[in-house]
Amino acid sequence: MKIIIGILLVFFVTFSVGTAFGHGAGIEASPLIFTNDREVKVTVELLPADFYKSDQKMIKIDAYDHTNRETITNASFKVQIFNDNQLLLDEWFYTQDGNLILEVDPDVIVTNRNTIEISGEKNSFGLWEKTDTTPLIVTGPIFDEGGIYTFKIILDAQDEV
């Protein structure tokens, strides 16, 4: 029998980016959050290890169910990114396999120098979703300078147990 479990979690992750604050890369995870008889952890990782100096920046976000020892699939993530308390990004994303990968290119200006934009496709629910042919790319002035970056992640998952 299939049971659909809905999970809604919120957590904050803070990264320091820039030479004044260290290497500017890393991985941060929420504490274990207990919901629906499950222990869930959400992780945000900045890739590669030399994220701030790299021309190929990526953000990887996933949710892991420690109870079942599996990545949570069919996950929607509301991703908010702040730099020194200024909101830079506030969007919903969907990933079927549970691993959200955002490519980041702060040097590309699509329509406005001061605007952060997303290239990719939206699904029928209006959520950004990577496809086989279209990656999700965040462009504009994000991670283009040092400072304290805070991620606020809301997880809304409909996985099968």
Where are these regions (language model features)?
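Secretory targeting signatures
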Residues: 1-24, 61
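N-terminal soluble domains immediately following signal/targeting peptides that reside
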Residues: 21-161
